[in-house]
Amino acid sequence: ELEWLSFIPGIVKGIGMVINIFTQPGDKVIIQPPVYHPFRLTPQGNGREVVYNPLKENADGSYSMDFDNLAQVADDKCKVLILSNPHNPAGIVWDKATLARLADFCYDHHILVVSDEIHCDMALWGNKHLPFAMASEKAAQCSITFGAPSKTFNIAGIVSSYAIVPNDTLRQKFYSWLTANEFNEPTLFAPIATIAAFQQGEAW
């Protein structure tokens, strides 16, 4: 839905915004290493404790989510889980069953999932990206998704990212804050470049 969508001035900035809007100092943020280092630095820099739920390395060298460990490390202070979907740097295009299982856990434990999907247009070798919010109804109701054209189309300097928030309560709280602080207003070139990339950039 159109109203689910908003401009944001960068995904790492968006993560910082979510942390400050939806958590308090001393709350915990779950990450799944090995993962993009700002997932750790941004919560820590904002006075939140980082909880580690490392991926499991399988015998064939692939990785999978460790749900047993997640159940052990998550407690009532855990308010946010930052998901890399597809995963950077492991290169995993998460399947629906995995994402739905994660959604079940986070929804039932009142944990907000921030899904960084900046690499979604770069799934290769027949893999198909599934947005976290489309994995299940619970996923849609407990998540904020971030994306951008910058990685796929090499236009990071344009500074154009977006948020998608299906849940009414989460969206009202997040987007009201963005509006009040004028963080939802793109530069002149950001929407032009973004539309051009997605409509005409397939050959690239």
Model-derived segments and their meaning:
Residues 1-104, 121-122, 129-134:
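Conserved core of the PLP fold type I
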Residues 23, 75, 112, 137-140, ...:
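Alpha-helix termination/capping residues and helix-transition junctions
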Residues 46, 108-109, 139:
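Helix C-cap/helix->beta junction micro-motif
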Residues 80, 112, 144:
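Short, Asp-centered acidic motifs that coordinate Mg2+ and/or phosphate
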Residues 142-204:
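PLP-dependent aminotransferase class I/II
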